[in-house]
């Protein structure tokens, strides 16, 4: 649980930083005056609305002009506010004489959705009618990622057991990450099995549904609740067919086939007892595989006669051969350097014998140090200064 609590605390701290510049009482004053504040983003990506409040520099204001950074509250909004690991919608709010470009949406206090952005042109005023529209392509990419996270979560729990419960996530356009408790690195065979299982279910094109119900009903249905998340009496259950059921307030695709492809990229540690899987979904996953295919083709062309499945062994053999050649070359250079050094006559300076020499060949620092130590041991009361050049750099020992 320690790792899970750390992830939750990090998410809370990040959200607190995004609202630190505004006194919460300013938000509450807008919320108290608003007649209704409604999120319609599950069903719509654009809608008519009206501005219920504007904040600039952390203070409520009646209007804002081009160039102003503002926070706006609307009566009705299709914009999804960041939460549950899902990044916020981007888009625009257009008024009669002005337009705001929205690049962040937050809920600084429960029930209040705040849209943040810059007034790109004209002027906006409190109370005026506006048209709000989200970036549909971004939303679709994020929704794919969120549904993919649910499916990857379920697959890990099936394979590793119930301890592999989500301890954090981020759903971005075309990519996602998934954190979960684990005592050590997850074997590659498990990652391959998760990927195979999830993509197999994409082919089945399972229906993805979202249903509101009570917590009791959700538990009877077997829906998964995440540690550290807060739920009301009524909850929203997102189901991928009959396979994965999870309490979630995020946006999702309509069918699993819309994900196209899920590709797990990496698995790593992000803290004591917590592992992170990063992945791509949809077009981003296909682009990644296309790049990998081009790289593979290039390697097979470089290594004549090699089949793709033979590349790891062939490259490993080549690396070992190169290392052996480097060792032999180092031995040869050391022997050649020693012979060249034998021709150098020490210069007596008082009781000290000075041996200073610049080699005619390129020698690295290790070889120079070895030669210097051997020479110093051979000649008593000696000071040895050796130099060479290597890749246009002066090397001293």
What are these language model-derived features?
Residues 3-397:
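A glycine- and charged-residue-rich anion-binding loop/surface
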